[in-house]
């Protein structure tokens, strides 16, 4: 017996919507996920349609060339004078200190204008003498060469310098011959010195750097390691306060005077009332002049000798750029460098070029300027 099959009428649209709403209420998270996915699909379809309708143009970008800047040139300075030198090797050249006579019979001297640093002090009987130091400059003639004293050895020691001289006081010779110095005494190296015929002894011993450099090389003295003065570029002061300088050292033949020349920013040196000249190169014109007050006494060695206290501290005046600057000199020990210290305890930088330092006795010397 057949059962009658009843046909169900199709669901109406409002019933489907009702069921969908019920399902969404029961599954809210799935609803959001489906909606989000739908939005993304629609967005991708829109982008694809736009891209097909408006294809992007390809832009050719030329390659970027990167040009490396060349490194800034390295500037090398002489540790002795602060002036520019050719290369690093030049900054390490051996320093040579030469004792040069300053009695009237020795004037005008040779090679003194090219010295980097000069120390001037009384050697005996009020007669002054120079310790002239050279590094990058190589004069073809230097002299007259004379004997050394203990305080010149003290000043030369920090420069790791060869010391050129003809004998010396007992204390000085004992010091320079103790094995701690580069002693190139004429007594033991006569081939590096000669006597000139146009002057009489003892004011006629000369040398040059062709011979001294060969002598230094033969002994292995090819480099000098030392700390020089702090240096700076020179700049004339707009209102100079020291254009005329007088230094009283001993007698009239040895007292010195300097006139400031603003055009060259240097000092024209005079001694004994006359221009102080280099026989081959003319007027001596240091860039920096320093008056250094020192204690000086007489001591018995191989006879009575002058003795100057070189270690410790004392007053000094630096003349550069037309200005006088009162400072303190300081040297902690024989092998420590000489420094000039301002009121704030800082080292005063000196102008590049020749520096002339005069040791003035506290007991009877002096310096004045205007």
Please place each PLM-identified region on the residue numbering.
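N-terminal Lys/Arg-rich, disordered targeting/topogenic segments
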Residues: 1-36
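A surface/extracellular/periplasmic glyco- and lipid-processing/surface-interacting theme
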Residues: 17-20, 59-115, 124-370
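Long, intrinsically disordered low-complexity regions enriched in Ser/Pro/Thr
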Residues: 24-28, 41, 50
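Hydrophobic membrane-insertion alpha-helices, especially the h-region
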Residues: 35-48
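Hydrophobic single-pass membrane-insertion segments
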Residues: 46-61
């Amino acid at each position: 017996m057949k059962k009658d099959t009843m046909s169900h009428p199709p669901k109406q649209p409002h019933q489907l919507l009702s069921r969908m709403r019920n399902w969404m209420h029961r599954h809210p998270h799935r609803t959001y996920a489906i909606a989000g996915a739908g939005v993304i699909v629609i967005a991708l379809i829109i982008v694809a349609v736009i891209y097909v309708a408006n294809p992007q143009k390809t832009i050719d970008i030329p390659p970027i060339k990167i040009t490396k800047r060349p490194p800034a040139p390295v500037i090398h300075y002489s540790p002795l004078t602060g002036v520019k030198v050719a290369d690093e090797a030049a900054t390490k050249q051996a320093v040579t200190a030469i004792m040069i006579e300053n009695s009237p019979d020795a004037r005008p001297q040779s090679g003194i204008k090219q010295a980097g640093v000069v120390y001037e002090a009384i050697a005996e009987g009020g007669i002054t003498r120079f310790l002239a130091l050279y590094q990058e400059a190589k004069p073809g003639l230097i002299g007259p060469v004379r004997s050394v004293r203990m305080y010149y050895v003290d000043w030369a020691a920090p420069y790791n310098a060869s010391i050129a001289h003809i004998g010396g006081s007992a204390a000085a010779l004992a010091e320079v011959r103790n094995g701690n110095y580069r002693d190139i005494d004429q007594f033991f190296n006569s081939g590096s010195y000669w006597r000139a015929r146009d002057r009489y002894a003892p004011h006629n011993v000369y040398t040059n750097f062709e011979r001294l450099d060969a002598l230094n090389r033969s002994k292995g003295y090819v480099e000098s390691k030392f700390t020089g003065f702090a240096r700076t570029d020179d700049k004339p002061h707009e209102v100079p306060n020291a254009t005329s300088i007088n230094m009283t050292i001993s007698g009239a033949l040895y007292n010195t005077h300097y006139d400031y020349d603003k055009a060259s920013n240097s000092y024209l040196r005079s001694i004994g009332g006359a221009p102080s000249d280099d026989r081959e190169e003319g007027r001596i014109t240091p860039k920096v002049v320093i008056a250094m007050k020192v204690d000086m006494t007489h001591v018995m060695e191989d006879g009575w000798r002058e003795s100057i206290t070189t270690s410790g501290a004392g007053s000094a005046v630096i003349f550069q750029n037309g200005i006088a600057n009162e400072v303190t000199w300081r040297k902690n020990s024989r092998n420590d460098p000489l420094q000039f210290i301002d009121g704030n305890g800082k080292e005063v930088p000196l102008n590049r070029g020749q520096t002339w330092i005069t040791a003035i006795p506290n007991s009877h010397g002096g310096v004045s300027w205007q």
